Amino acid sequence: MAWDKSAFDRKVGELAQPWLRRALLAFFVVVTAALVYSATQLKVDAGFNKMVPLEHEYMRTFTEYQKTFGGANRVLVALRVKGADGDIYTPEFMRALKSATDDVFFIPGVDRATVTSLFTPNVRFIEVIEEGFAGGNVVPASFRGTPADLEIVRQNVLKSGNVGRLVANDFRGALIRAELLEADPASGKRLNYRAVANQLEAVRGKYQSDRIDVHIIGFAKAVGDITDGAIGVLAFFALAFVITTILLYVYKRSLPLTALALVAALMPVVWLLGLLPILGYGIDPMSILVPFLIFSIGVSHAVQMTNVWTQETQLGHDGQTAALNAFLKLFIPGSVALICNALGFLVIMHIKIDVVRELGITASLGVALMILTNKILLPVMLSYLPATPGPVQPVADRFDPVWRAISAFAEPRFAVVALLVATLFLGIGSWKARDLKTGDLGKGIPELHDDSRYNRDNLAIVDSFSIGVDVLSVIVQTKDVQGACTDFAIMDTIDRFEFYMRNVHGVQSVLALPGVAKVISSGWNEGSLKWRALSRNPDVLAQSVTPVDTATGLLNTDCSAMQVLVFTRDHQGTTIAHIVKEVKKFASTNNTPQIEFKLASGNVGVMAATNEAVDAAEVTMLLALFGAITLLCLLTFRSWEAVLCIILPLMLVSILCNALMATLGIGLKVSTLPVIALGVGVGVDYGIYLYEQIKHHMEDQGESLREAYYQALRDRGTAAVFTAVTMGIGVGTWAFSALKFQADMGILLAFMFVVNMLGAIFVLPALAAFLVGPRARAGAGRDAGPTHAG
């Protein structure tokens, strides 16, 4: 049975009673007050596990061996001598290094067993002397900072093999390395990364001087810096609010209409922020932009509603009747558009990363709330306005010549031009989009600008040391082998892997058990380089392996698993993909029933898993998104022609967005993949609103396609252009954000908002000219030009 719109209209008219309007207003006021209070309980909620795809095969390996070999949540604090002269072997520097090591050790959330520096007892040296072996802590317990003590430490550092690891290659810096727990051991709650970052910053403030520089990198410090930058989002929200208010007033020329539109746009934001603590969610720095997106979408729909209300009052209706008619005209297409928005947010939940799923949940919830606030509350508030709230000039009349000209694209002769231009853009976009890369494309972390303190620290550490925070951990798992560390075949395979990876482009250094064992073997034989090899004799091999403690992270207690640490020059997506490909290539030819090379741990392993998850999700996400929108449009308009007219421009803009990302050097990653879904979800509004009016004028008024499109532009086009430009300007201000990922999202969203609007205005009617026009001409028997609808 077909849906009866006239019956729906009559039923709504019967319900539009004064008591119901007052009850609805009271309900919204009470709920808003309660949710405002709840929003005060909202907290920033960031976590390492939320940022990674825990279901990915690499992450299963990571989780399995996290307690044995440590995780990827590492912090590096580097102290470096300032100036052109000098090195670390001074009393002043050593005092600072020891004190800083103690401060890092006592930061809540630090896994104290993993703290490593020249002053920790897990950093030792072994040397060959006439009597055999000698060794001890690199910095002896008797160290007092005398010249003799400093010379002893200098020699011990060289003997320990820590140059490039804990001591800079030029001897002008030293590292403190530590790993963080996921939960605070004191409270048992999730670790507060911002608090850890603040304490690390306090370490910097304490030891930074005119003689010493302090550099800090690691996940916790990155989260802290991103959170600090995210607070600046509030300033951009305020700026966008001011810009929107000014543009709304210029557009509406009415203070009451401007105020009501802003209230309706802000209401779902307030409700969303209030519901998050109730549902057990916080707000992650990566999704702190969602409230602004909800506000932008709210403005778009509020402008459409107030626009139709104004048109109704100009036809002579009183405020209440105008509000009712506006509700009847926009509730169905507006709700369908909002559901499409929500689907755009929901499909990104296909990416199995908690922070992305939370973004999808919060954004779709905000859009769902908009059906209540924009489609129900706003008409109720409008019903209390008088028919002439201010000097409202018909905006459509001002743009009438423009709409007359653009309506020509609904005729085949002009539609061909629009479609040829669209095809040209499609070809250029498809060609350029092939250059889009997955993952990070710059040095440092992409969430912050290249000149940020964090990325400058990262560059300083990478330039000074042979290792950085970027490490790929490959786990070598043995099966049914007793004492794998003394099995020559096993150790030789790992040794060959170590050599193979050391020669892979993008690898900075490699550390594995066989390499260490060969050095020890040489030590047992008076340091002879001829003995720097793996012995085939298990007893001799055992002698070389025994001194290597499990605390090094190179082997577990029974030697059933060994870790190969591959330090990378950077963590660009292309670098990671190449290194992972080489690991898989070696594993495919060397895995046996006794030995298996398993990816991956370390922060680069986490990035590899994330990049692969994003790469795998892109096509599926877009198919699900366009499939869902297609189904909704088909159910709404009962026409495949309508579906194609609405969907094809969106697909074109999605391809152009990928091309823009490739051109600007923005990689496809967790923070940018949702932009395409969000842009499509928001962009479908324009097509639905315009096509709904085209359908209405053709079927109910019997008008030609061009005349119907002209009327649709007068009714909906002005509001569509205004909202696209307003949202584009609002998110465009993000380009000046301290957060690079926010700046990237701002540029991409501004592009999506504006170009989706242009696609709906120019490409949609051109498609309709060939898909809908012939059928309409056959049915109506006419092709009239536009006339002024006064």
Where does each model-flagged region fall?
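Interfacial segments of transmembrane alpha-helices in multi-pass membrane proteins
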Residues: 228-283, 350-354, 621-665, 736
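Signature of alpha-helical transmembrane segments and their immediate interfacial
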Residues: 1-46, 380, 393-443, 456-459, ...
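Short helical (or helix-break) motifs at transmembrane helix termini and adjacent helical loops
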Residues: 293-314, 334, 341, 376-377, ...
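Hydrophobic transmembrane alpha-helices and their membrane-interface caps
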Residues: 257-305, 641-691, 732, 759-763, ...
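Extracytoplasmic
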Residues: 95, 143-255, 266, 492-495, ...
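Juxtamembrane segments of multi-pass membrane proteins
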Residues: 409-410, 414-538
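Hydrophobic, glycine/alanine-rich multi-pass transmembrane helices and their short helix-loop junctions
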Residues: 247, 276, 335-377, 382-383, ...
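Helix-loop junctions and hydrophobic alpha-helical segments within the transmembrane domains
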Residues: 312-339, 698-722
